[in-house]
């Protein structure tokens, strides 16, 4: 069972996501701010995926992503953003986010993105079990960053065409 962390300041939406994802078989923690997310990540040891809003009351989701990477937490990071914030999603992808999803969230698309990201992360964790040095972790982060940058370029291209 994958362990997810939802970071969403809209309490009703975050609770709905948490309930729905638990019904889909995920273990789910929820935070309403970057500070609360940092506490969860610091105390839980690890998660398999972070699903975060970009705009949060204390900081933004990109600052959480940066904190995670500085603290050697390489779990996939999916950004949730409003349609009007597509350029912020591009920036998130360039910063190392695994993916993004526009609000309002379509459940089937969200579930597919979560499954894709957690399956990829599980495979990379298994391959890293043999080699746990920092250099290996950095290699995976670099590979994830290249994938995210390709998605960001596709996103930028599609926004220019519309």
Model-inferred region functions:
Residues 85-87, 105-114:
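C-terminal output helix
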Residues 8:
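Conserved acidic carboxylate
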Residues 11-29, 117:
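Two-component/phosphorelay signaling modules centered on CheY-like receiver
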Residues 62-73:
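Short amphipathic alpha-helix used as the core "switch/output" element in two-component signaling
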Residues 53, 81:
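Active-site residues of response regulator receiver
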Residues 30-49:
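Acidic, metal-coordinating helix/loop segments flanking the phosphotransfer/catalytic sites
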Residues 33, 60-63:
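Acidic catalytic/metal-coordinating carboxylates
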